[in-house]
């Protein structure tokens, strides 16, 4: 809450509202929607960004660890979509829902299996709702980022900066995404300029998934490749 208060102080605004809630709790999200409804506020954009994650081999994963990630990511997304989307439809209001996913929701990944499974579920929830809600002038889009520099998630999953050390090998751009790059893409996708982009999840990973999926791409990381790349 203090971080939200600081942001409002920085932008010197008295017209913004902020709430503290557990997205996995349906009543918490419903209470937010009820408060907005009483103020006659209908969100133009809903960003589904809450997440939870930790590194753990599957055979050492506890039932509670699995359940907590699924509750936050998948059930939290259901709560957000179900409550706000249903209300917009009932009131005949348009809107845009933006889902923040991850590149490994498509590929899967060791050590973050609960998160990968939950994010894949959210991606398909979004795709199904794209078809059901488009007639109501509600558009759904997604962003699938790789590691983001300075984000809370990256700092927790990579306390020793291993991502940065290995970026030269796994990422063609040899760096992590900046928070500004993610926010600017989010602003575009939720704007009227992206009105015809619907049901799509846009990767922003510097080409990392592409590089690591090609059969011979690994050769570009070893000196052997330089002989073929000379002018």
Identify the residue ranges that each predicted region occupies.
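Active-site loop-to-helix junction immediately N-terminal to the catalytic Tyr of the SDR YXXXK motif
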Residues: 61, 108-117, 128, 153, ...
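Active-site loop of short-chain dehydrogenase/reductase
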Residues: 41-44, 88-102, 135-138, 200
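Short C-terminal tail/terminal secondary-structure segment
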Residues: 187, 198-231
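Alpha-helical segment proximal to the catalytic Tyr-Lys
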Residues: 86, 131-135, 195
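Conserved NAD(P)H cofactor-binding loop of Rossmann-fold oxidoreductase domains
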Residues: 49-54, 207
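Substrate-binding pocket helix/loop in short-chain dehydrogenase/reductase
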Residues: 57-58, 65-70, 167
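Active-site helix of classical SDR
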Residues: 81, 118, 126
